[in-house]
Amino acid sequence: MARKTERVILVALNEPGVLGRIAGHIRHEGWNIKRLIADEDEVPAVAGDDGVSEGNKTSTIEIDIEGTHTKLAQVMERILNLNCIVSISMIQNGEKIIRHRPLETKKSEKVEEPAVKTPPKKTGSFRILAINPGSTSTKFALYDDENCILAKTIRHDSAELARCGALLDQKELRRDCLLKDLKAAEVELASINAVAGRGGLLKPIESGVYAINEKMLEDLHSATAALHASALGGIIAAEIAGQQGIPAYVVDPVVVDEMDRNAKLTGMPGVERSSIFHALNQKAIARRLAAQLGKPYENARFIVAHLGGGITVGAHRYGRVIDVNDGVAGEGPFTPERTGAIPVIPVINMCFSGEYTQAEMIEKVTRRGGIKAFLGTSDVVEVEKMVYNGDEFAALVLDSMAYQVSKEIGAMAAVLEGLVDAIILTGGLAYSNRFTGAIKQRVDKFAPVHVFPGEDELLALAGGVLRVLRGQEQAAHY
């Protein structure tokens, strides 16, 4: 079939990573992006972390895309479901088509859209509901085996979340919004075979698919787990599953700990290195590459770098992550908003200077460091626009982050004794050819470099549960 080029004009809210999310959806459908222009500047498509900028400022994005099929309207319809999109215009069969959606909503649920009827479950397939709560959103998707038949992101109003009080008290609000969307899509809960929830800050566990039990629910309600909205994933999953008499699971939560003993030791007794990283996405992408290479993940030696608002680089040896930088506690490369590893004595001096509280220092390390501290933004799309417009300091900062990622990959190559089958770059920042190119230039002598831009944690959740339902993997017990 002859390839053809279509031009699409999007109006989108100025959100972090908006270009990357749009580009990811288009590429996922089998189209190639030939040109992408935003705000009259040609910039690479890069994705950052989820988040909504204050106000309703918009950008006009012009894309030329090339593909071998004629399903562009369906692709654009799915892109219109992204909360960042205000309108889409395109030419279809010689006719200009314009689709709009309201700029904002004050409700916790998404702007009302025409109900999309979910197709009936195929005979012999497994239907899995996957739930991934974020700080101000709840993402969910419905899968028939590996096929996504419904996916939504519910944006919650910050003021309404605040009225709930404690984070765990948001459960009813988020659950009810999710159930409302399922009902609007005519999904019968009785058609679902299992529910997967994003696991929170549980006790350290090995990688796997874990059946949610009373002990896990107790820990998900603990003070530590309640620090992050991901705890609500397991709680809501268990509640929905319990009402239907079906199993609920979590898959590879951030606390997966398979580190070698000598990787945990530090030079200060009483302070050990912890394994807190993007386990779900790292493991899922590693399995995907292993399948492409025709090699079981359990027989592979990979280095996986998750590149996003947080950056973690893991050494995967025969199915286990034997070393990885702690993406929260200040290890590894600096990131769009985290400091990464920094000299300790100057930090001690800052802590005892009397200028900062403990909370302020933690904020500086985890949310106001890295690129944001240097350039005032954590949005790498904006940083690349600065570089494109000739900002030499912005180029230095971005290239320094790539340098530090490369150095961390080199460290993990040493952990694997130089025997590396492949290096994987994934996460939102992997959409940037400039950023991944700078890393490749330094590390491609260690092993072939494979780039998997973006992440699909909902698919990873569903995929883990599907392996259990098919009998390919046994569920672990917490």
What annotation goes with each model-predicted range?
Residues 182-229, 247, 255-267:
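Short beta-strand-loop/turn "lid" adjacent to the catalytic site in phosphate-handling enzymes
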Residues 38, 128-169:
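Short glycine-rich, Thr/Ser-proximal phosphate-binding strand/loop in the N-terminal lobe
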Residues 1-110, 115, 204:
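A conserved regulatory-domain signal marking ACT and ACT-like small-molecule sensing domains
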Residues 231-239, 250, 265-301, 310, ...:
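Glycine-rich phosphate-binding loop plus the immediately following alpha-helix
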Residues 420-439:
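Glycine-rich phosphate-binding loops at beta-strand->alpha-helix junctions
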Residues 430-431, 437, 450-478:
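Glycine-rich phosphate-binding/hydrolytic loop that grips phosphoryl groups
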Residues 363, 367-418:
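Adenine-nucleotide phosphate-binding core of ATP-dependent small-molecule kinases
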Residues 150-188, 216, 220-225:
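N-terminal phosphate-binding loop and adjacent alpha-helix
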